[in-house]
């Protein structure tokens, strides 16, 4: 089971095409109501889709999945909150290869895919079948966030800029 959820920057149309190419995998999705209405006719039998649910339910739904999959439709930072939530819950992230995501997911901290359905399909299948590697990737990403994105690191960097 894989999870995709959130608001801004998600490429829902592309995600639906990935799900259609992987009928044997369940896709748990949480999308905004307008996107739900726009795409509901295209949901496959392997898609469990909810919209506009409370955050606690969102997190519980995410935790029922092995991997968080987030195709993006923008180069701008998007999906970061979902990635942080995934890391906090020990879930590996697979997302679009963008300038922003390259920085976060380098060195085995996640997987990046291009605009090719087969690439996404193969990557998702690989990590669903290799749980230890997915867990290791999730742990690396969690450590990276704790070390590089902490309030302490931010304060030190800001202080260095002010006095430097």
Give residue spans per PLM region.
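A charged, aromatic-enriched C-terminal amphipathic alpha-helix characteristic of glycosyltransferases
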Residues: 129-162
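Acidic donor-binding loop of glycosyltransferase active sites
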Residues: 62-78, 91
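Conserved acidic donor-binding segment of nucleotide-sugar-dependent glycosyltransferases
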Residues: 107-118, 126-132
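Short acidic/histidine- and often glycine-rich active-site loop of Leloir-type glycosyltransferases
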Residues: 38, 97-108, 112
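Conserved donor-binding/catalytic core segment of Leloir-type glycosyltransferases
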Residues: 1-10, 16-20, 28
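Conserved acidic donor-binding loop of glycosyltransferase catalytic domains
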Residues: 72, 95-97, 113-115
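Conserved donor-binding/catalytic loop of nucleotide-activated donor transferases
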Residues: 63-65, 85-92, 96-97, 106-107
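Nucleotide-activated donor-binding/catalytic signature segment of Leloir-type glycosyltransferases, i.e.
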Residues: 31-61
